[in-house]
């Protein structure tokens, strides 16, 4: 539609992602200043808006804005809100809870690629983005009612065990984290997979055409990726 090359799209995607990561540093900390449910509500609404914008792409500017909002609200703030909520909600079983919560993302990585490829065989891509936008908004009140209604963050686990007060985990400041060399060691291991996966996601069309693969090959690869992700979550 926009007559851009794979390389140009990759540059637009990378620029939008980089900008969203900088904005995430500022917006992400707002979750500490407001109700988590309200914060998550705004994030989901923004995700719906970004999905709708994809259906209206008519220029490179619109494409950049849509990718920026999608990366910020989707993989950025949605993951951030989920991890932050779980970390506050659990203390003794925090690691297990975080692993379980990520099953949602892995399940989506398993189901959605094949589903989207199938739907694109008889639904125009712009209509599909509109449908996704509507589905996100319609799902929101259901999720609120069944999962977070009247939930208090201090009700899941007791703060005492055998009449002993569990020591609180130290709350690090951002400057303390940046000064700790271990942070950069962890970053190298955590950033490797996202870089590799993002490259595969962005250039999946080019990879498929150059290898002469069918439309379902990449989608099936995502399914295998999600299965292995689930396995490693509990290792």
Show the residue positions of the predicted features.
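Flexible cytoplasmic inter-helical loops of multi-pass small-molecule transporters
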Residues: 148-172
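Central cavity-lining transmembrane alpha-helices of secondary-active solute carriers
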Residues: 11-29, 223-235
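Symmetry-related core transmembrane helices of the 12-TM Major Facilitator Superfamily/SLC fold
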Residues: 127-146
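Glycine-rich segments within core transmembrane alpha-helices of 12-TM secondary carriers
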Residues: 91-114
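Extracytoplasmic gate region of multi-pass secondary transporters
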Residues: 175-233
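Hydrophobic core of transmembrane alpha-helices in multi-pass small-molecule transporters
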Residues: 61-77, 191-192
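Intracellular juxtamembrane helix-capping segments at the cytosolic ends
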Residues: 76-90
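Conserved MFS/SLC helix-loop-helix module at the cytosolic interface between two early adjacent transmembrane helices
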Residues: 22-60
